[in-house]
Amino acid sequence: MSEEIKDIIEAEKEYNASQIQVLEGLEAVRKRPGMYIGSTSASGLHHLVYEIVDNAVDEALAGYCKHVVITINEGNTITVTDDGRGIPVDIQAQTGKPALEVVYTVLHAGGKFGGGGYKVSGGLHGVGASVVNALSEWLEVEVSKDGKIYQMKFSRGHITQEMRVIGTTDQHGTKVTFKPDPEMFDTLEYDYETLHTRMREQAFLNAGLHITIKDERIESADKPEKERMDSMCYEGGIREFVRWYNRHKTPLHEQVIYMSGTKGDDTAEVALQYNDSFASTIVSFANDIHTPEGGMHEEGFKRALTNVLNAYGVKKGYIKGDDKVSGDDVREGLTAIVSVKLTEAQFEGQTKAKLGNASMRTLVSNIVTQQLAEFLEENPAVGKAILDKAMMANRAREAARKAREAIRRKTGLESGQMPDKLRDCNDTDPTLTEIYIVEGDSAGGSATQGRDSRFQAILPLWGKMLNVEKARADKVYGNDKLQPVITALGAGIGDEFNLDKLRYHKVIIMADADVDGSHIRTLLLTFFFRFMRPLIERGYVYSAVPPLYKLSRGKTQRVAYSDPERDRILAEMRADNPNAKIDISRYKGLGEMNPHELWETTMDPTTRTLRRITLEDAVQADQIFTVLMGEDVEPRKEFIEENAKYVVNLDI
């Protein structure tokens, strides 16, 4: 735990019921769960764990918690244990009930609202514990505090056992065990890697906090034979986070540049390091919550970075006259983490995608302006390496502009000429239209015949696509495999990307559910992530989910999109006759489906399954692409060996 964060906590304050403030009741959660956890899919299921862990991390931020343990138990129940102070158990004045009961049964009750319990905190608008309780079939909480162990039990938000003392202890902390409610969620299967990724992130963001995650399920879809457990603790905090992001890349400078500062109760820290790639990775957080759409803190960082490097370049003579480098130029090859912790965080959107506090733009900008300038003066070799790369990016940007002009003249793009392979739709309103980017000509043919041509366009991709890992915009523009995608979408790429010119508001990647299909998806996602990021930020990119199985009993036919769904449908079809003959056939590929099958299973808006791609998916794809397509052979070999038998479901 850094000294800056400790300084902003009033650590001497006793944490008791007087700091628990009640704002409103729990009624709405089960009626509209998506409002509180985003969705009732796998994403929402995992969000339950994050909410409980966020409460433990709040204790860490306050300087009281050093170790958090997350256990996936048999039956996909979850236990989260921390060694913090323990949730208060004394009577809360506003309600006359034990504070523990209030925290778990009243929405917006917690130590993060009054300002007395926590100065800074995460959690989805502070609703965590009660929402998890409302959406759990059952939940048990044990609090070790003041020499006693207190226990309370709930079911779907209602008390099944009043708070009582069940023993004595010399420990302190909170232990929560819950089982998600099958009435509320589409799936109950926890994915170890999803939880591991999030917990690793929390460990990086809270230097010195020890987080352990373990999987004690005897059998599960994603579990190898051996026991799974990971313990994470990073004394270097976000410095180590940057090194982790750059682990498969070649840094331009060995030292990670670290900057931090405070204003009142608010703190900000920034860590950055340049590498030899052409991509930019800026990951921002507010109160340990990832802000994938950025916000004021990220804006302040970008503005200061551009200004400082231009000023340094002019001062040292690298930049002549008005030949300034742009924001895109200075961010090429940059990996940066921006983390702020503030008392009154204002997030845009229910899921905290963007930070709205203007004060954070000023704080981060001031810190970077002063401390980065000082670092460059003290480390001129690093300054020169960064400026050389930015100037090279500037020249490449000019080359890309010329390449674009050449391509426009060559392809007639200016006159609106579309790619030969594109089978466009009749409607021209982007809000109503969608384009399927399809793997292979044969699948493209079936899709073209099976589509609804009023609003569905088809673009087949074929052959080997460009490795964008080592490609600048000028190379991308000239690539004959990606050019049709750029032209068909109509919005440009890179710094010229204009969302207003986008011709379709649904861009759907349709590829087989095999290794080749996964490769196509990964490559396209990486391309969109690096050259058309607003497309993903606005939620316009989707992945089609083709079915895996067709089940037939007589004239009745049904399709399944996963093994569990296949088993469920099989049981339903045999409900009246356990010995009924049911034929199960596996779809081998999109190209093997006839147009009618493709329409019914994958393209009909009333029956298809589409998965919206998030920035987190794209970041993961980008990381994997760096390993698989980069020049470093060893990480690629390790990745393939580790995943050959247990293929990780990227859900992309």
Residue ranges and their predicted role:
Residues M1-N16, L26, Y50, D58-A60, ...:
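GHKL-family ATPase ATP-binding module
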Residues I87-G110:
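Short conserved segment of the HATPase_c
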